[in-house]
Swiss-Prot record:
Signal peptide: none annotated. FAD binds at residues 199-200, 337-339, 341, 354, 356, 361-362. This is NADPH oxidase 2. One of its GO terms (biological process) is superoxide metabolic process. Heme b 2 binds at residues 115, 222, 226-227, 268. It is a multi-pass membrane protein. Catalytic subunit of the phagocyte NADPH oxidase complex that mediates the transfer of electrons from cytosolic NADPH to O2 to produce the superoxide anion (O2(-)). In the activated complex, electrons are first transferred from NADPH to flavin adenine dinucleotide (FAD) and subsequently transferred via two heme molecules to molecular oxygen, producing superoxide through an outer-sphere reaction. SUPFAM superfamilies: Ferredoxin reductase-like, C-terminal NADP-linked domain (SSF52343), Riboflavin synthase domain-like (SSF63380).
Amino acid sequence: MGNWVVNEGISIFVILVWLGMNVFLFVWYYRVYDIPDKFFYTRKLLGSALALARAPAACLNFNCMLILLPVCRNLLSFLRGSSACCSTRIRRQLDRNLTFHKMVAWMIALHTAIHTIAHLFNVEWCVNARVNNSDPYSIALSDIGDKPNETYLNFVRQRIKNPEGGLYVAVTLLAGITGVVITLCLILIITSSTKTIRRSYFEVFWYTHHLFVIFFIGLAIHGAQRIVRGQTAESLLKHQPRNCYQNISQWGKIKDCPIPEFSGNPPMTWKWIVGPMFLYLCERLVRFWRSQQKVVITKVVTHPFKTIELQMKKKGFKMEVGQYIFVKCPVVSKLEWHPFTLTSAPEEDFFSIHIRIVGDWTEGLFKACGCDKQEFQDAWKLPKIAVDGPFGTASEDVFSYEVVMLVGAGIGVTPFASILKSVWYKYCNKAPNLRLKKIYFYWLCRDTHAFEWFADLLQLLETQMQEKNNTDFLSYNICLTGWDESQASHFAMHHDEEKDVITGLKQKTLYGRPNWDNEFKTIGSQHPNTRIGVFLCGPEALADTLNKQCISNSDSGPRGVHFIFNKENF
């Protein structure tokens, strides 16, 4: 239990508080509409569907208030910077912003479904009551408002049978129109957010996600028409529904039961979302301001297997290890921004990214930079680009530990280029505050040739460490997870050579996936009574594996070895 608390305690606490707030709001507002006399006649008309529609609406307000906050990248970077004095456990919660964003989105989808279904029943019953296709009591309540000086309870005022009556409500009432629009927006946003769409059709994901603007506008005005109505406070003093509801034929004829008066609930949603919407507007203004700042591409390097490196400079640009930026190239697309991990170190006088050419946008950038041509390209011919960032990630905490495990899978190796470079600069310059003493680096890939630029970096570090007589500082393992029989024979023939046949490094490439249980046990035994940071940039399946290993191999007491799991999310 103690092992689990070390890694997941605060995260679970945050989730439980969030779930608790959802349960509290649902129960509270269910009782608000299910018990008080104010909605006595509304319940007689709509039944339990009234409370079942309003309770999830309150939860929707709460979650729509939260949904924008995890994607305010500049706000999160500010909080991460201002919380530098806090423990890494606190800062790690900011690195799970996208996970929380997705959880809130699914909660919105759940409450939207409940809210919509309940209101479909409400509309059906209201329409039926207006066309005398209901019980006499509901018909009588629905007729209130037809005479002068009466206020209505049933928001359906036209006498049109279903299903035409329901469609009429959907296309004429503000709540119906906005409800249809925001539900369609939500469906499109969620269905285009699957992993397959994001990876293969990023443009679809990008553009449909911007339907959130329509979603929030529709949400803010959804209740402006006040169709959910209850008895007014003044009317309740004159007309007590529990005493008068059985004498509906005598309403207005006897003193104690005058015709009840009704009014709609004032819209509340805008009060929940105006704050986050203002923060997000500020976020977008900051992004726009940054995008207008001049960025100079100082060098474009073409690496094997369609990978390019962009080295850039921007006035006032300051970065930390493992951070990422968003890049826009107007020549390729005037609206699209794409995230890339910085591969340069803070100590260098430029910042760089490595881009694998795998889609339409990257292919367009590849051609715009002249990388498809053999001849040298002049700098003035390079395209203009805009940069937003940098933004913080879990990797910033790498210097908070004495021992770290860095695990990169495929292109997920890029954040660690920045870390390894920076560590080496600090080591060579004998940085007095360098706490980090040992790095265990794991690189899992199906084809190392696709990332030869990183193998070149490792070769450089290997050579420099030998010159400094400190080969024990960095222990690295390159694991090739994909090969065929001919490659296996070739590897076997050259196994006894001094340098690895694939990477040219002295450390030989391993074939297959690491035995993580053995790796964690070995590292834990070599560093007792140590907090070991585990940093991953890779797929969710590997994240689950490493997270479980961190929990199972951490000691339960306050002393002993503790593996602290961190994952890149951007």
